[in-house]
Amino acid sequence: MADKEAAFDDAVEERVINEEYKIWKKNTPFLYDLVMTHALEWPSLTAQWLPDVTRPEGKDFSVHRLVLGTHTSDEQNHLVIASVQLPNDDAQFDASHYDSEKGEFGGFGSVSGKIEIEIKINHEGEVNRARYMPQNPCIIATKTPTSDVLVFDYTKHPSKPDPSGECTPDLRLRGHQKEGYGLSWNPNLRSCLLSASDDHTICLWDISTVPKEGKIVDAKTIFTGHTAVVEDVSWHLLHESLFGSVADDQKLMIWDTRSNNTSKPSHAVDAHTAEVNCLSFNPYSEFILATGSADKTVALWDLRNLKLKLHSFESHKDEIFQVQWSPHNETILASSGTDRRLNVWDLSKIGEEQSPEDAEDGPPELLFIHGGHTAKISDFSWNPNEPWVICSVSEDNIMQVWQMAENIYNDEDPEGAADTEVQG
């Protein structure tokens, strides 16, 4: 009986999702300046823009690149580098190019040929997460379904993978007992990598001292303060010895690598009422960070007084797995997760007065809801070169590259585009 009810619930949910998607598609020309939807061969659990951009002469687009991965059904997995053509500001937009079937928009008409897979490198099992080293973006670290963290220099691998399927990373980083997701390169110290694991620990490697023989590097330090699965880890963006971690023990911990005590963090705070899945330090303000949780909220913190939560962002209907500050705007951050939505928040709007109608849509700081995905969002990334452009990937193979309409984030609109809180 329960099976029948579950099947009925699933069917109802699927119908609701499809209806919502149809509405979203119809509204994209009003809500976005750009939407590109691309079906990947396999879903990617990870997405990160590379920092480089090329602007071909005489063309009305620029070429950006992404680090992706695969999550296959028992077939060969790959670490993937893809290229994406984004239209320039002066590209000739033509409303007739709106593809209502796909909900694609932005003067480009069809996306075919605009997103291409450039490099595929054999990988052991799915790519849980992949992140490039800021000081040398050719170096990419990956989290695997095993306890190993792999490091690839993609310039040393052919762009087409060896048909044997053999995975030949340039380094294997050892120290964990189980798999995990969290991965963070130190932006201020070259070659220093942190990783979070289901084994309750955080490992730190320095890959500048590469072994003479073999490819195995053992962890330099193992941090053991958490009492449950460590979900995410992140270096502070300005202080080379500080990092934060979050875990299923509901705690946010701040660590200092200069301390000799690897089992006790500098600060530990009960951050949420459920598992804490992600964290992000603000790139502009050295004291501010955000955490995202299974309690459906994003929390805002000040390192100077962690006893007091600055703010709680509430609108998500399910677990939050990603939170990322905008690289271009100090007050903007985005979050995503199981509810298939990516929310963009603006701190500067916290506490603004709202009409009752607006309040029904969400709090004033909720700037935008991206509703283009019909499955759980696995990861997203802010484009470092094009403000307000985001790439998001979901469990149903879909990758979307999108930019909300300018009148939503630009308050200078004389026609009073004050009703900026829109739902995709």
Swiss-Prot record:
N-acetylalanine found at: A2
Cited Pfam families: CAF1C_H4-bd, WD40
Cross-referenced InterPro entries: G-protein_beta_WD-40_rep, Histone-bd_RBBP4-like_N, WD40/YVTN_repeat-like_dom_sf, WD40_repeat_CS, WD40_repeat_dom_sf, WD40_rpt, WD_repeat_RBAP46/RBAP48/MSI1
Localization: Nucleus; Chromosome, Telomere
Annotated keywords: Acetylation, Cell cycle, Chaperone, Chromatin regulator, Chromosome, DNA damage, DNA repair, DNA replication, Nucleus, Repeat, Repressor, Telomere, Transcription, Transcription regulation, WD repeat
Gene3D superfamilies according to UniProt: YVTN repeat-like/Quinoprotein amine dehydrogenase
WD repeat segments: 32-125, 126-175, 176-223, 225-270, 271-314, 315-371, 372-404
Transmembrane regions listed in the UniProt entry: none
GO biological process: chromatin remodeling; DNA repair; DNA replication; DNA replication-dependent chromatin assembly; fin regeneration; regulation of DNA-templated transcription
GO cellular component annotations of the record: CAF-1 complex; chromosome, telomeric region; ESC/E(Z) complex; nucleus; NuRD complex
GO terms of molecular function: histone binding
Disulfide links within the chain: none
Function description: Core histone-binding subunit that may target chromatin assembly factors, chromatin remodeling factors and histone deacetylases to their histone substrates in a manner that is regulated by nucleosomal DNA. Component of several complexes which regulate chromatin metabolism.
Family: Belongs to the WD repeat RBAP46/RBAP48/MSI1 family.
Subunit annotation: Binds directly to histone H4, probably via helix 1 of the histone fold, a region that is not accessible when histone H4 is in chromatin.
Protein name: Histone-binding protein RBBP4
